[in-house]
Amino acid sequence: MVIGLGNEFRRDDGAGPAVVARLRGRVPPGVELVLTDGEPTRLIEAWTGAALAVVVDAVRADQPQPGRMHRFVLDRPLTGTTRTASSHGFGLDDAVRLALTLDRMPGRLVVHAVEAADLSQGQGLTPLVAAAVDDLARAVLSDVRDAGPPA
């Protein structure tokens, strides 16, 4: 399963949905592509029961380098200098905390993130984030293929 997390109407927060759009028709049979705004219960509902969930998101960093990509394998909430770019106050960190409490984590959770430049209202990714979309899609596809066919 690949989950594009974000809001296409908040500039670079649309990176996750943009990657999912690039993956349409390219993922192996049985791999589900999902879009969500990052609300924790919707994320948990999407990945519950999945052997592998790959989440694609935009992040804010304390010392940002827009377009820089990160990959995390999560079994606990994110810490440090990156934060999800949720436009409504909740996001991936909250979903992981809640899923751990409820024992509803996927078998493996991989996050591919890109550092955002602009999270203001508006459509369209900034040039540096847009330039990272193809590389993110390739990285996600590699993780999905390495995991083998969905159960």
Predicted features and spans:
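N-terminal catalytic or cofactor-binding beta/alpha core of small enzyme domains
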Residues: 1-116, 123-134, 139-151
